[in-house]
From Swiss-Prot:
There is a cross-link at residues 225-251 (Tryptophyl-tyrosyl-methioninium (Tyr-Met) (with W-97)). It comes from Rhizobium radiobacter. This is Catalase-peroxidase. Its EC number is 1.11.1.21. Heme b binds at residue 266. Homodimer or homotetramer. The keyword Metal-binding applies.
Amino acid sequence: MDATSKPAGKCPVMHGGNTVSGKSVTEWWPNALNLDILHQHDTKTNPLGTSFNYREALKTLDVEALKADLRALMTDSQEWWPADWGSYVGMMARVTWHAAGSYRVTDGRGGANTGNQRFAPLNSWPDNVNTDKGRRLLWPIKKKYGNKISWADLIALAGTIAYDVAGLKTFGFAFGREDIWAPEKDTYWGDEKEWLAPSDGRYGDVSKPETLENPLAAVQMGLIYVNPEGVNGKSDPLATAAQMRETFARMGMDDEETVALTAGGHTIGKSHGNGSAANLSPDPEAAGPEYQGLGWINTKGRGIGRDTVVSGIEGAWTSEPTKWDNGFFDMLFKHEWTLTHSPAGASQWAPITIAEEDKPVDVEDASIRTIPMMTDADMALKVDPIYREISLKFKDDQDHFSDVFARAWFKLTHRDMGPKSRYVGPDVPAEDLIWQDPIPAGSTSYDVAAVKAKIAASGLSVADLVSTAWDSARTFRGSDKRGGANGARIRLAPQKDWEGNEPARLSRVLSVLEPIARETGASIADVIVLAGNYGVEQAAKAAGFDIAVPFAAGRGDASAEQTDADSFAPLEPLADGFRNWVKKDYVVSPEELLLDRAQLLGLTAPELTVLIGGLRVIGANYGGAAHGVFTDKPGALTTDFFTTLTDMAYSWVPTGNNLYEIRDRKTGAARYSATRVDLVIGSNSILRAYAEVYAQDDNREKFARDFIAAWTKVMNADRFDLI
């Protein structure tokens, strides 16, 4: 407002819309089940509409022209944000690193697969200072190619091209990442209320990195991985090394990859801390409209070039920071280092003595030499015995270092894309990599009817068939596109021994289904799903509905050699509300664990509801438990679960931890037993609304058809070949 503006008055209309302030429903009732994570990324938020197909749009992309434009960008310094040494390679590598580096293997969330760096909280993390400038530099290219290139793909490609321009022979690149259009609500980044709060709150014992809270992979709120100044900002390279090992492992990286990514990430570019962070404007989410989505603008000085402030650490790591070489290891091992501070006050390491020719030149004036630096994470590579051995090997063999880094960079930027079948473009590497969870192509030429006939004659119960198929498919994670029924890894270690898969029952069922696969030429993966489908069809028929469950042949069977057993450990279910099972008591409630699994499976709240009701009456509970089986006709796909839950003839009485009885209000007699997961379908107002739909007399067939549709969605969740 200008100086003549009147004082703000009360608006007679705006109180009707909660656009800025006021408590949300979840703030008023913080213990209520928050179903928002199932409703995010709705088609209503996507401006491209439901008919847009990104994979089809990619077919029209001129990839070579795009790469040429990106190469030109790397040396096209802009006055509003000048390039260090006339090159943006370091900046673009950082933008990509900080997008991909948020991935964690525990739940598959984070990473570069969605373009989430454009939105809160990542766009405003302290560790992402000035990535907003990098994305703004990319905007003219995004504008030019439009819908043919997603932001997610462009951000991932930018860093890859940066390394190419710097001189690295990169391993390859795949397109296929689709953009989201709003912040992710499902990702838990920690419960701290302030940026860079001490690490102690997310560790059982901060001196024991393995006690970092799951599923987190970063040591502090707002960081990508470790604090470059040391644990809680206190320099101790050995302690930092221990945190690095755990953090990178939670990103899916081993020690060699950790060293390669750390050193390779610091071979080009520099850190910026030549000034005071107090002079910076708020982050993008907090900045005023005049900043137009940018943040961290220096309000009291140039704030660009040599005066830029980002992490607060100041300096380059190598003598030639725009060139891919072995300069990082040469610098690290050639000198002795002493702890010092940057102009911004950040802890960093400086060489005790250094020859003038080994110093990097100033980013603006090549006649000026500057002092290089190392972070605590860099020094960790020198002092940790394992990291040191790897580092020295890299130092003495640049070709080996370059190859390991190129592969690790490819893994970093593609780990959350899922299997190779999702890769698009001319630069997809031919080599199959174990972390891609390779699956051989399956047959589609066998007689499906003959397989079903053998399943029907197998003597296996409907509950056995349905439970085994569900257990095989439920491992799918929409976050990083891992898991699922394709590959039939449920028959391999470690899945065959997971408690949640009921190993004894699973072994018995597989001993019947595997011979059927061999006899018919079908994959065991297909037979498992087809058996589940047959079970659902029989349950529907028992309820009076003759409905065929859709089936698409073509799943393959992965081998033990194609399966990294250790990497599948994070996919083990610790609870499955759909089968009414929890491994043990957790701080998180069973219904919250159910919600998390439903979100990873890509289910909506109505689909969650219909699957719970159907699986209960079919009798698919873990161990054959009776909890939630609100029917006198188990094995039939009836609406009995919902009619019982909504019947006021019953009361619900707690009988133990996570256990309840449903009792007749008049006689007090116990009718059924239930868990919290069962009762939340009737207690949560949103889920109850869906339950009432299925309890209606006119929706019995609708329930059966909706259940089959949701079931098929889960069975086909990993069938990217059908897209």
